[in-house]
Amino acid sequence: MTPIEREVAVRRGGPEDVVTVADLYSETRRAAYPQMPHAVHTDDEHRDFYRKHVMDQPDHTVWVAEADGEILGFAHCTPTFLDGIYVRSDLRGRGIGSLLIDVVEATHPDGYELWVFVSNTDAHRLYLHRGLVEVERTDGSGNEEKAPDIRMAWRPGS
């Protein structure tokens, strides 16, 4: 792992971050899943979703990792669920995802669960390395993308 050259800080995201966060979500999904059709939702729909259903909801938290005012990645979670860790493609493998997971674990003392697509081997490997365990695998028939996925869980002390 090559550390990033700039100092990275994590802060709670706010409404002012919605466009950057939603666009980063779109970009990272395209990079992580080149084999998947991306017409399930447009970039504008992602922005609208993050604006209406994430950034303004009291039970949703977005943690952004930034350096010099630039958002490099983010984590989106609820009290029991991690929607995902999203890091700019050109910055993967530099500890930003682990930094975000540190914050998620610190703010979820009872643990959390997440879903990861089987095809996202880098994320799956990171989550296993961080101590998450596989709970369930599906054929993807229950998700919008119809892609096989894995439910994983992290419990403190495991």
Per-segment meaning from a language model:
Residues F81-R92, V116-F117:
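A short, internal acetyl-CoA/4′-phosphopantetheine-binding micro-motif in the GNAT/acyltransferase core
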Residues A9-D23:
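A short beta-loop-alpha structural element at the N-terminal edge
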Residues K52-V64, F81:
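A short helix-loop-beta-strand connector motif used in the catalytic cores of GNAT acetyltransferases and
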Residues S98-L99, S119-R137, N143-A147:
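Conserved active-site alpha-helix within GNAT-family acetyltransferase domains
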Residues S26-K52:
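Conserved GNAT-fold acetyl-CoA-binding loop/helix
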Residues T107-S119:
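Conserved GNAT acetyl-CoA-binding A-motif
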Residues V64, E70-Y86:
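Conserved beta-strand in the GNAT
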